[in-house]
Amino acid sequence: MPLVSRPYYLDFLRRHKDRPIIKVVSGIRRCGKSTLFKLFQDELLADNVTVEQIIDINFELMEYDKLRDYRALYEYINERIIPSKKMYLFLDEIQHVPSFERVVDNFFVQDNIDIYITGSNAYFMSSDMATLLTGRYVQIEMLPLSYKEYVDAYSESGLSRMVLYEKYVSEGSFPGLLHMSENWQGRQDYLQGLFNTVVLKDIVDRLKIADIKLLESIVRYIFANIGSLINPTKIANSLTSAGRKVDNKTVERYLRGLEDSLLLYNTERFDVRGKELLRLRPKYYVVDMAFKQLLLPDINRDRGHVLENVVYLELRRRGYTVYVGQLTKGEIDFVAQKPGGILEYYQVSESVLDPTTRDRELAPLEAVKDQYPKFLLTMDELYKPHNYNGIQQCNVLDWLIGM
């Protein structure tokens, strides 16, 4: 299967190409950052940029292991700079180089160097890095394949959208899994290896965690409660009741590590009436539902929250800041905020064919009295648009592919 095009992320790189600003792509391991660089470099070569003008270093590869010292990295790059040419510098998985920002800052001030970097966790853009490069970089968050990208990859398969959705949430949306569609054990091994790398290599090593089983128990608890309101106290109490004694501070620390690894997303609650954030229990969502399938195989028992997770990730892909909407009575699944403060409200339900279910799902949206757009996303087939007092019901698969 050829490389999967990632038009949204490619467009980001194209927009900022040759601008005096550092391009930063962050995202969980194996979500496609290296492939994105390869696709963009192919475009550069097609646009008459020569191979000598491209310096590409992937710090996950053994051949570049010696460049994890920032001084050696500086020398390596400096030797390859052609002063009379425009140079394109790609630093992939830069978090492996302590003090890398000193190298980036040095080459940034040279007019003929266009810089692109990636990292696989939230902390590689540390406060020191952000301070040094303030105003000098633009950042985009990269996620695994969207449902639309997944459907496009299977465009010649003849499979229905519904079948592809089931594959998408059960088999996983990491690009590397597309080559293993018929190999169940291969997919399991790939996901287990990726999970071990993210959890054991990134989180355990960075936080110096001794009790790996406790960390795994916390992950399982979160996965079993996707889309539910939880906090460290609730997790600690549940694990302690099950015989795993743990305090709130430890759970909080482990949760922060899981978020920093980009495996989990903490979604804060938003007071719809007062238009402000609340310091209440958040909800958590996972970067790919296949991780839940890996640890908790009976995914069908929680189809509603699985769909909710898919919608949450898609809203993030589209550039929204996403919150849980808190009402005086009840809540709205998602309050999505665009840059500039414009809001949209989303309720997600597998089906609202039953009138009682439909009324229950519409009620939170009807309670909102402002004029921002309101959407009800369901799996129900719609042969014509449905509108309930300004609330637009959409087929969620249509919405996911942008129809």
Predicted regions and their residues:
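Interdomain motor-coupling "hinge/lid" segment immediately C-terminal to the ATP-binding subdomain
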Residues: 120-122, 127-229, 265
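Short glycine-rich substrate-engagement loop in P-loop NTPases that contacts/grips substrate
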Residues: 55-84
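Walker A/P-loop
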Residues: 34
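Domain-level recognition of nuclease-like catalytic cores that cleave nucleotide substrates
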Residues: 381-403
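Accessory nucleic acid-recognition modules appended to NTPase machines
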Residues: 182-342
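Pre-Walker A adenine-sensing motif
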Residues: 3-18
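Conserved P-loop NTPase "ATPase switch" module shared by AAA+ and STAND
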Residues: 82-100
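Hydrophobic anchor at the beta1->P-loop junction of P-loop NTPases
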Residues: 25
